[in-house]
Amino acid sequence: VFYLKKIYLIRHCESTGQEPKANLTNEGLKQAQELADFLKSKNIEYIVSSPFERAIKSIEPLADYNNLDINIDDRLIEKKLCNKNLNDWMDKLKISFEDLTICYDGGESSNQAMNRGVQVIHELIKLENNNIAVVTHGALLILILKYFDRNIGFSEWKRLLNPDVYLLEFKEDGNKLILKLFMK
């Protein structure tokens, strides 16, 4: 079976927090090196990342190893659930995976977040590069996968690790394959 494109969707490594400038923890820095070691054999030719520090730092070791630039795309930032801290944020997030149109105060709906993430994927498919790394955040990563497989949702989000890697493969005939990759 001939696959036209392989897109590695990557959730960032362990970070010190959720804010855009949050850096990786010491464990996260170690994970970034392990991620690079894991991806070295995948012939990554192009890297695109969320502008958040934790995403960029997660892929830097691979970018250095492959001598690649890290292209920044603001559309890969995390889904904004709402504009304030909620005690029941996990319940609200779960609901947002079921009702993709629901939008909490100052946040964005899952449909809005999904659409901006999927726009990036559709643009990447048109590139000449065949093996592409996309570094993003948990909820957005799952929403991108959900676009291609409606059965994916909250339970997959809950099982995400830092880092985590999913492979999206696109065939010439338009068929797609989603695989969760295990680094260990």
Residue ranges and their predicted role:
Residues 1-3:
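Short, Lys/Arg-enriched N-terminal segments with co-localized hydrophobic residues
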Residues 5-71, 108-111:
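Active-site-proximal alpha-helix that buttresses catalytic centers in soluble enzyme cores
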Residues 7, 128-139:
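Generic beta-sheet signal
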Residues 15, 140-141:
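Short active-site segment of divalent metal-dependent hydrolases/proteases
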Residues 23, 64-118:
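Phosphate-handling substructures
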Residues 41-43, 124-130:
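Glycine-rich phosphate-binding loop signature in dinucleotide/nucleotide-binding domains
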Residues 51-52, 75, 134-139:
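Short, well-ordered beta-to-alpha junction loops that form the rim of enzyme active sites
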Residues 151-179:
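Domain-level recognition of soluble alpha/beta enzyme cores
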